[in-house]
């Protein structure tokens, strides 16, 4: 897929490692509507701080992104360097620096290699082409094992609207407002307020529902740019068109979010924790999140052990009131626990077979209300520890 | 050490595995003062529910404990079986069942093997001897690799008072009121209200400050029995004697708590996270606990990587306000981060050498107040995953 007006480029800039794409550019041939959802961590990387400011006018023309260095915990010097990288690009593209969004991912606390930018901005801009989207998706990978992109189109008000999304992230993933990095472009015609209105709930239901290891990054961000090329009548709040747009955006973000979970560091399985029968959505989410973050639950999944006791134990510390002897738990369509008690050995044997699959849904019914939420996670493997004991070396 | 009036026994009852001590008994030759701190998990094992009730009168004569089965999530049947085990023991000892405290540890959700109790209560009672304390400490081990005991004596009001403590626990350890299991006996003369008064703050500063994996067990408990044999004048609240007693009890609990962390599942290092300069104790604790529970921080310690960026990132999601650019972080006596910024490569190299040690203290100074708290944890290793992927098989 291509979207007219957008072009992309990526180069091997040697920011931290040689011989890999590590500097990417998303460019629109004119300033377009933009919105973002950025990390809620108190410790925010320099590019996050800059983007919060630059997104205020709801307008952007380019996203400059690097892997290899997060430019986080780098103080005034880190801010200064980030500004310099933007200015280098602005000069090369002959656009305003304020319309460039910056994004970094990689090791925290090390200075950004500004020389790598200086030497490579020119070839980066020269490489811009409408079919280079996936090269950028590759350039933003760190411990990811696969590139993560999503192409989607939907009819809004009788007009075809297109979306192209990418994401990266495999560890330090329990986004709170955004994942590590995700960029989506669309040709929808939409105002910046309406774009923000669509983005916030879409992020809440997608990136904010995944967890690999319970850690929230300093650099998390989702950025969306909409250039209006589809020429639909501009989307107004509260209309069917707004609902369709939000649905399509959420589809793209969910696809990317699940790709992140499936590629979680060391993950061998994707696990959906669905909590139903809660009194409130927030309680359902809290229970699901506590289970999804339990190291004991996640190692049991890795061991393909239908250890529902660990699930109930995790639920018990979630801080949400429920009656343990009303709880049902099933793996796929096999009920393991009914009214808080084991159904029996043969159900466990069937569940153990289900655990050999790559995608598993755990349903927890609290039977005390009508609210339901899902959280998406992966198992906790030996490779997770290997990857993270080793990441910087 | 022995304490007159107390005797101990343990047998191989075959509750889950053969050829290992798995049933233990702590017995006092008369009913004595007792207090407990039990799990705050909403999901409470049968013995926990029974003990909460039986501790109300502040009096007990025996503790019956088994490993191999937690008797948690077992409903009415589990309660019934627990009562039966107590009655079997009461009959054999010719004491009141209400004076027997019950304790179980092991797999959740499986029925307790009552026959193993029936067949072994008699040899268990026959084996009672004043020097069998460590046999009970062995009988309560599950994934523990070493028995954990602590002997301590202290002068209170001019009289020598003795303490004998044991604990077990290696995984599912983020106690909230208690660790998995810990039993302490003492010959102090003290009322039940005063004993409870001493126990609560002592648990708060010790077992409630350790975390192996962020999971709180359904079976956590600390039980203390005091038989008055030291013949000190009974300890009154608010006196020097009360302070001395509380200090001694806290010493014993801290010793046992740190032994649990050092023997954390798969642990290769013990790590103290000390947060200073906080505005409130609770904020210091919250920051320390968030860092101590971060999988990324813990895997970095396993990898002996002085990755302070992960520490700052974890702090950023702790929900506690602080200025990242005021934070100092040191490993041992090496300052790695000053005012939120890296001190430099040579400090990191020195810190990396410190990480090769078995016990490491991380000091985090928020520089925004005068409050300090410590949380104790261990690293997150490949073996943790192996142990927990494999525990039930």
UniProtKB/Swiss-Prot annotation, chains A, B:
Encoding gene, per UniProt annotation: argJ
Origin species: Desulfotalea psychrophila (strain LSv54 / DSM 12343)
Binding locations of substrate: 142, 168, 179, 265, 388, 393
Taxonomy, superkingdom: Bacteria
Pfam families xref list: ArgJ
Keyword Manganese carried by entry: no
GO CC annotations on file: cytoplasm
EC number: 2.3.1.35, 2.3.1.1
Primary subcellular site in the record, as a coarse category: cytoplasm
Family (UniProt): Belongs to the ArgJ family.
Catalytic EC class: transferase
CDD domains: OAT (cd02152)
PANTHER family for this protein: ARGININE BIOSYNTHESIS BIFUNCTIONAL PROTEIN ARGJ, ARGININE BIOSYNTHESIS BIFUNCTIONAL PROTEIN ARGJ, MITOCHONDRIAL
Protein name: Arginine biosynthesis bifunctional protein ArgJ
Site positions per UniProt: Involved in the stabilization of negative charge on the oxyanion by the formation of the oxyanion hole: 105-106
Role summary: Catalyzes two activities which are involved in the cyclic version of arginine biosynthesis: the synthesis of N-acetylglutamate from glutamate and acetyl-CoA as the acetyl donor, and of ornithine by transacetylation between N(2)-acetylornithine and glutamate.
């Amino acid at each position: 897929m291509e979207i007219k007006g957008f072009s992309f480029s990526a180069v091997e800039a040697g920011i931290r490692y040689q011989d890999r794409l590590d500097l990417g550019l998303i460019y629109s041939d004119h300033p377009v509507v933009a919105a973002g959802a950025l990390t809620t961590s108190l410790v925010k990387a320099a590019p996050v701080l800059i983007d919060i400011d630059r997104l205020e006018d709801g307008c952007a023309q380019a996203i400059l992104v690097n892997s290899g260095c997060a430019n986080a915990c780098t103080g005034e010097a880190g801010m200064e360097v980030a500004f310099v990288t933007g200015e280098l690009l602005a000069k090369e593209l002959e656009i305003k620096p304020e319309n460039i969004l910056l994004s970094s991912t990689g090791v925290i606390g090390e200075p950004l290699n500004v020389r790598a930018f200086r030497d490579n901005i020119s070839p980066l801009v020269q490489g811009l082409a409408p079919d280079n989207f996936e090269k950028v998706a590759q350039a933003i990978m760190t411990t990811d094992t696969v590139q993560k992109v999503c192409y989607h189109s939907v009819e809004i008000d009788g007009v075809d609207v297109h979306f192209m999304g990418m994401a990266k992230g495999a560890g330090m993933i329990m986004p709170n407002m955004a994942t590590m990095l995700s960029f989506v472009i669309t040709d929808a015609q939409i105002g910046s307020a309406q774009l923000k209105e669509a983005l916030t709930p879409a992020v809440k239901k997608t990136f904010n529902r995944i967890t690999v290891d319970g850690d929230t990054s300093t650099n998390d961000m989702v950025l969306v740019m909409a250039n209006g090329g589809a020429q639909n009548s501009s989307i107004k709040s509260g209309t069917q068109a707004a609902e369709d747009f939000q649905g399509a955006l959420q589809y793209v973000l969910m696809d990317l979010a699940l790709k992140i979970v499936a590629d979680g560091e060391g993950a061998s399985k994707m696990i959906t924790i669905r909590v139903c029968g809660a009194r409130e959505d927030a309680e359902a989410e809290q229970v699901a999140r506590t289970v999804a973050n339990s190291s004991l639950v996640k190692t049991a999944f890795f061991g393909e052990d239908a250890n529902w006791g660990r699930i109930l134990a995790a639920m018990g510390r979630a801080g949400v009131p429920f009656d343990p002897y009303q709880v049902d738990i099933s793996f796929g369509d096999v009920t393991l626990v009914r009214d808080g008690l084991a159904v029996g050995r043969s159900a466990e044997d069937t569940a153990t077979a289900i655990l050999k699959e790559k995608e598993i849904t755990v349903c927890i019914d609290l039977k005390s209300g009508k609210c339901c939420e899902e959280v998406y996670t992966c198992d906790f493997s030996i490779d997770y520890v290997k990857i993270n004991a080793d990441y910087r070396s």
